[in-house]
């Protein structure tokens, strides 16, 4: 078993198994592929690996549509493989976090199959079925496009799906549903996993089923019984363990996230929120093409840092995951090799000096970029394909639609991990399930490890700093120069220590503002700071005299 780790000082490495490492040649990553690369992950220095879902699934939403919570998808391997992964990871002092989806199941799940058999079936109340003679019961929108209700002709009723039509929402108001889910969570605890990431967990409590003058999310986001349900989940499953738990929170608030994570409330350890990753949306709409609103990014990051700190909660900090574009393409610059490397290092430093638990998404540590696909045929993500057809139907030109997908598609982060400059980036001996980014000859793990100045070693150093300096984990945060057009500046204070963080989000050199005391020891740096000027995409952390 791995050594005890203070989860607040821990760093998590997210693995998207389908795109990580294929050992069978079928073009799909697998569990044995993860085992094969554990030494690499250990070298990076993280404490946990988080696997996106590996359960049985028809894969309409790449595993987030679970048809059997207690079996491993054969594409990824076997239960024996998963057991071996946990054993080998623990031998290397790595903990394993499972992604679990308990807001909805696949429509291929046995519960849903039973529910469709008749209106009197006991599993009918596991889901939200409603009769309606006038079309869908409400005008709520699915997050994947279209109405959130699907007509089922088998029993002449509509069922709720906040996501894809193949993902039916579970009725948490039904105690039998909750107990069934708690048994599943306890099964995996007994199996030996060390933590859980709960998908869209703040949507589990639905309120009134009324028409909305918006898209309906006000009726189910942070719903009326959500804190009651999470407290019960905690008490009946992981609450008496040292497991790390994190909830993915959709369109939530600071106030609710404090409640979700205050230790005395006994709900979750920490939360993901995504407000800082909507700063390139136009009027809150994802499927638009927009530049980074830098002032808004700083404002949101600091609101959440201060709010969670003051409220005694705990937040995750991250730039990337399996649902987001690659940050170096999004907020940095991938147009040249020099700019890619420099901006990736700057973004890493800017984020990892914040309070919270850092999550590093596979490939982020080597500066992987968006793939810049040029055809809809290259996309695999159901949300992106739906958006493509929706935008075309609204009259947008195809070139404009592809440009939007190129900026916002979830497939940007789902291209295979680039291990080397060998065929297929060393990911597979077969045909990969999705195209590999064409820059793998320059951007790959092999090259990163050979160059001590690479992005990889910046991430490694940042992880080491978090493990060894309490100021990063426990210190207060003070924003500085929030009105500056290019610099992200903040201080960290803890006991008699004070650190100053300066990050230049511009490709050009920037003069440092007056009043910015910079005397002290350099903790970590990328780029240069000379003659009161910081280089393009430069960043520096200085331990100053408090």
Task: Kindly give the residue locations of the regions a language model identified.
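Carbohydrate-interacting/catalytic domains
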Residues: 1-56, 83, 87-89, 353, ...
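Acidic/aromatic-lined carbohydrate-recognition and catalytic surfaces
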Residues: 2-186, 190, 203-255, 259-263, ...
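Active-site regions of oxyanion-processing enzymes, predominantly non-cytosolic
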Residues: 188-198, 315
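Hydrophobic alpha-helical scaffolding
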Residues: 219-223, 287-294, 337, 448, ...
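Conserved alpha/beta catalytic core and glycan-binding cleft of carbohydrate-active enzymes
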Residues: 107-143, 230, 234-416
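Active-site rim elements
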Residues: 168-174, 327-341, 442-453
């Amino acid at each position: 078993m791995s050594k005890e780790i203070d989860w607040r000082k821990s760093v998590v490495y997210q693995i998207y198994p389908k795109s990580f490492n294929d050992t069978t040649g079928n073009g799909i990553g697998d569990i044995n592929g993860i085992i094969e690369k554990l030494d690499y992950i250990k070298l990076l220095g993280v404490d946990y690996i988080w696997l996106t879902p590996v359960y049985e699934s028809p894969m309409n939403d790449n595993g987030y549509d679970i048809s059997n919570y207690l079996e491993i998808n054969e594409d990824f391997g076997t239960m024996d493989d998963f057991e071996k992964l946990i054993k080998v990871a623990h031998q290397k002092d790595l903990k394993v976090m499972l992604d679990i989806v308990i807001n909805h199941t696949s429509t291929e799940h046995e519960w849903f199959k039973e529910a469709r058999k008749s209106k009197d079936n006991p599993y009918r109340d596991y889901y939200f079925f409603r009769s309606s003679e006038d079309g869908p019961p409400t005008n709520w929108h699915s997050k994947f496009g279209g109405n959130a209700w699907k007509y089922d002709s088998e029993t002449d009723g509509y069922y709720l799906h906040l996501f894809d039509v193949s993902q039916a929402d579970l009725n948490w108001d039904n105690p039998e549903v909750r107990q069934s889910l708690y048994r599943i969570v306890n099964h995996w605890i007994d199996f030996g996993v060390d933590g859980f990431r709960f998908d869209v967990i703040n949507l589990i409590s639905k309120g009134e089923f009324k028409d909305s003058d918006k898209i309906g999310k006000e009726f189910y986001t942070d719903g009326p019984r959500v804190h009651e349900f999470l407290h019960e989940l905690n008490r009946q499953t992981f609450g008496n363990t040292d497991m790390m738990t994190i909830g993915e929170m959709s369109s939530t608030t600071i106030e609710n996230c404090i409640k979700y994570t205050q230790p005395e409330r006994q709900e979750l350890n920490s939360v993901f929120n995504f407000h800082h990753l909507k700063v390139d949306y136009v009027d809150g709409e994802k499927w638009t093409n927009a530049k980074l609103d830098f002032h808004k990014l700083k404002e949101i990051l600091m609101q959440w840092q201060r709010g969670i700190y003051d409220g005694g909660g705990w937040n995750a900090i991250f730039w990337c995951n399996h649902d987001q574009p690659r940050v170096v393409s999004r907020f940095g610059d991938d147009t040249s090799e020099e700019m890619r490397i420099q901006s990736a290092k700057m973004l890493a430093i800017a984020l990892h000096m914040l309070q919270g638990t850092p999550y590093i998404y596979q490939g982020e540590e080597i500066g992987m970029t968006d793939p810049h696909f040029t055809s809809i045929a290259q996309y695999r993500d159901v949300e992106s394909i739906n958006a493509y057809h929706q935008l075309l139907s609204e009259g947008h030109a195809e070139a404009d639609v592809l440009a939007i997908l190129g900026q916002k598609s979830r497939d940007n982060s789902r291209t295979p991990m680039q291990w080397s400059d060998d065929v297929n980036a060393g990911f597979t001996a077969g045909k990969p399930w999705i195209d590999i980014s064409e820059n793998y000859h320059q951007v790959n793990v092999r090259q990163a490890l050979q160059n001590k100045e690479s992005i990889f070693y910046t991430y490694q150093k940042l992880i080491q700093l978090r493990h060894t300096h309490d100021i990063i984990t426990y210190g207060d945060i003070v924003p500085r120069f929030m009105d500056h057009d290019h610099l992200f500046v903040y201080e960290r204070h803890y006991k008699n220590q004070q650190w100053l963080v300066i990050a230049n989000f511009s490709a050009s050199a920037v003069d440092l503002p007056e009043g910015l005391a910079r005397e002290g020891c350099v903790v970590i740096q990328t780029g240069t700071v000379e003659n009161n000027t910081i280089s393009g995409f430069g960043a520096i952390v200085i331990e100053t005299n408090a």
